[in-house]
Amino acid sequence: MQTSDTRALPLLCARSVYKQYSGVNVLKGIDFTLHQGEVHALLGGNGAGKSTLMKIIAGITPADSGTLEIGGNNYARLTPVHAHQLGIYLVPQEPLLFPSLSIKENILFGLAKKQLSMQKMKNLLAALGCQFDLHSLAGSLDVADRQMVEILRGLMRDSRILILDEPTASLTPAETERLFSRLQELLATGVGIVFISHKLPEIRQIADRISVMRDGTIALSGKTSELSTDDIIQAITPAVREKSLSASQKLWLELPGNRPQHAVGTPVLTLENLTGEGFRNVSLTLNAGEILGLAGLVGAGRTELAETLYGLRTLRGGRIMLNGKEINKLSTGERLLRGLVYLPEDRQSSGLNLDASLAWNVCALTHNLRGFWAKTAKDNATLERYRRALNIKFNQPEQAARTLSGSNQQKILIAKCLEASPQALIVDEPTRGVDVSARNDIYQLLRSIAAQNVAVLFISSDMEEIELMADRVYVMHQGEITHSALTGRDINVETIMRVAFGDSQRQEASC
């Protein structure tokens, strides 16, 4: 955050930037400026144009018209290589690392020989408080650490303009604070940061200025200290209000299939002393009709536990009971057929086939149940049902999943999981990287699913989200659940954080 009002020449000045796709205006004369040593936050609803603007600045997508002034020089368009040479680096929401290469190889990949300085890399690692084993494979990192590796790649290229797309989406409050303290050190060197996020408290903490995009325009811009939260939310979307799903949406959302319906409170998924990679001796019960929160810091073992429940990782000990029957030896496909469905944390690498059509993605978990031949008309009808239920925005069923915004991709992934008719639904960071309006849609959706007596295991690093959504909460700390479930008034951010950090003094709540 800037410590002085004295400003040199802007690092970046975008003027009258226009862009359209298939005749649809995505950007309508955008003006955007970034100064040295400042954080300029960029907010906006689903499809507002944020990603398109940043891709133009990073040289990934050309603008139809307009100019970019960088370092006093004007450019009509950039390429990614030219943007890097000018000191621009985009850290994407979904880190683009090579999983089979080491952390060191990923950080240094593509650098010119003159930039291949091991000492510089070590200095950056120390400054950012990173304690990576540089020889470990990047594929072994969690999302938070992959994000840090992407930032390091930019810093190794002497970037002066960093574009951070939802950098804290999968970070805990403690990790977010650590990232922010490192960003402050970067700002002191004159680096400018474009900070894309939907988390208003974090934006108020880190940003000097805020710009809100809506429908391809800048709807609001100003100093953070001069803008109220109501102003910002109203600028994002006038219709953002807490509301239930409409009767029509609920009708379209009725779960398919003929799964037996459990009575509310019936145990659906029971874990007995589970031990696996990243966790040990975990026991809990997930009941029909409830949303059970699973909180904890990144690295606490929550994702590893979820992947083990679904059969993606090897179980080393304990029992998994689904509807009273042990499923330890069942494959992932067999668990799916019995009603256990998993929505993964990383929608792009694990959840969706980005090059496949939207209709194919929504029906991906049920294709084997429909016979050998694809049933395009039926798949399209299924997609249409979820479009109406979840307000998914797309042009045609045949378009590739990668063409959608992050929020709409997440809704497609949720639709895919629901189409499998879950009895127990595990959702890992379901609102990661989605806008304010879509986040509320997902909340209401999960409540509606639980109301149909589905048992929902809700994993999130956002403690406020856990407090808002969960009927009961378990907290993992260093791979273990050391306390009984939080209930009632104990479900609050302060208590959850204390347990997540290993505070053993909390009074135990009744299970």
UniProtKB/Swiss-Prot annotation:
GO terms for molecular function: ATP binding; ATP hydrolysis activity. It comes from the Bacteria. Residues 12-240, 264-503 form the ABC transporter domain. It catalyses: ATP + H2O + (2R,4S)-2-methyl-2,3,3,4-tetrahydroxytetrahydrofuran-[AI-2-binding protein]Side 1 = ADP + phosphate + (2R,4S)-2-methyl-2,3,3,4-tetrahydroxytetrahydrofuranSide 2 + [AI-2-binding protein]Side 1. ATP binds at G44, G45, N46, G47, A48, G49, K50, S51. Part of the ABC transporter complex LsrABCD involved in autoinducer 2 (AI-2) import. Responsible for energy coupling to the transport system. This is Autoinducer 2 import ATP-binding protein LsrA. It comes from Shigella flexneri. The lineage of its organism: Bacteria, Pseudomonadati, Pseudomonadota, Gammaproteobacteria, Enterobacterales.
